[in-house]
Amino acid sequence: MKNIILLLAASFVFSSCSEKNYVIFSGNIANTKDTAMKIGNMNRDFQKEVSIDENGNFRDTLFITSPGAYSYQIGRSYAAVFFREGYDLNLSLDANDFFKSRKFKGKGSEVNNYHVARSALKNKLVGDAKAFFVVPIEDFMTKIDKNKDIFLDFLEASALKGQEKEIQRKIIEHDYLLTRYNYDKFNHYHTKIHPELPEGYYAPIIQMDLDDEVSFIYDRSYRNLIVENWRLTSKEAMEIDPSLTQVSFVKNKIKDIKSTIIKDLMVSMLFRQISLKNKNYKTDYPRILEMLTADQLKEKITAKFVGVQNTKPEMPAPNFNYENYKGGKTTLKDLKGKLVYIEIWATWCGPCIKEMPALTQLIKDFKGKNIEFVSISIDSKNDYEKWKKMVPEKNVGGTQLLADKGLKSDFMKAFSVGLIPRSILLNEEGEIITPKAPRPSADNTKSYIDSLLNRTIIKTKSMTKTMKL
């Protein structure tokens, strides 16, 4: 009996290994001080940290959730990599020249080296974004049509075959459509004028196939196009029927789509409906929840719903206990008795840094007033020294804190903080005035804070008068 069990166990191990539902990923990173590489996929159902030794070497077995496009991140630099079960892929790169130095060897190297070369070709053809997009529409169309042909010729000259080649051909097509879509956006960004577009300009995007699961797991441009298709078609549908809700629109749009992960992407775009700005968010929540299939997304929208419920105006804000730049720790309870204006930021967040001069001015404007300005950084442990360096460099003022677990800290999760910068206003009792306050640079921020302070003064005087009586 024992021999039979051992034989069955050996058979199971052999069977499991022979399927090779994993990728071996190894290599060397020159000139890096980082001790780990982060690997993940676009669905966010695979995330792993791979250790990098003191010589820059790494090696790990990755039990991937599906073939497709993944990303590897070292420090702040990251790039795409294609994984498929059975790949034995070796990567070498120089952290000082991250993108240009990438080279792959081993099984799976052909498609990944092709991708590196195609990315370099794209950078060369596009060049300066302003010069590329700010041209008459006729010239732009001629340019992207020509570039598409160049990319297709480049693919034909490669060694790729079969499905791998077809996947890359579709990537070229989707990249072309996304570039076409972005013309208006980039042109307007640089000129502040929306260019006149020919009739039917967006038709190829509106009429695109929304049920291509292979493209979905391999191609970020395809995912972005699904989002843009959603925006274009929802706008059109609501112009025809103003009574149509976003939730009803999505429910109708996904009914003929077979891919559950594509359906989930479309439904997840409704998460913004779970907001105090939407008076129907309580009834929208169960309708959105029932359309989702992924447990991860169900948990995410439920957490957001609970967060909105718990962070409504006049609700007590959750406490925090964060490191203070000046030493020790600061809790929200320590700030009780003052209005608290919280600005959530990070050293790597460009828009956050752009808000700093305005925040500095606010702190000066309200010096001596009953308000505390608190900047909370969500930087990771790896960026601790950057935070310590940037605080005195920018010299914003106020109270400078560092969240213990970044966006995963309880305070951040309670407020469903996803995008930064984010501003929050609390009253003297630590209760929420607004979970989304105007940014420091907004035109109405100063007058809004003034009105809150004046309200407090009037309330205090009224209480004092009552006590005397």
Task: Label every model-predicted segment.
Residues L244, K251, I261-E323, K333-K338, ...:
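N-proximal helix/coil linker or "cap" segments that precede and/or mark the start of modular domains
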Residues L425-L469:
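Thiol-/selenol-based redox modules, centered on thioredoxin-like
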Residues K336, I344-Q361, S375:
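Conserved redox-active cysteine motifs that mediate thiol-disulfide chemistry
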Residues M1-G27, L452-T456, T460-M463, M467-L469:
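Bacterial Sec-dependent N-terminal signal peptides
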Residues C17-I167, I171, L178-E196:
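A non-transmembrane, solvent-exposed segment enriched in polar/low-complexity residues
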Residues M356-S377, P392, S447-Y448, L452-L453:
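Conserved helix-turn-beta segment immediately C-terminal to the redox Cys motif
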Residues N370-Y384, V396-L407:
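Thiol-based oxidoreductase modules, predominantly thioredoxin-like and allied folds used
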Residues E323, K388-I424, E428-E429:
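Short, internal strand/loop/helix patches
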